[in-house]
């Protein structure tokens, strides 16, 4: 589903942006957890789907 892929890409982009724009407390809380852990979950979920 294209919509699903776009949604996942948006989450990844937002997670990355959070770490870039908020390198302080916000970056560690949102970018660190969302970018590190969320990234693995997204890749793991997207691979079997394809």
From Swiss-Prot:
Coiled coil: none annotated. It comes from the Eukaryota. Pfam families: Fungus-induced. This is Fungus-induced protein 3. The gene is fip-3.
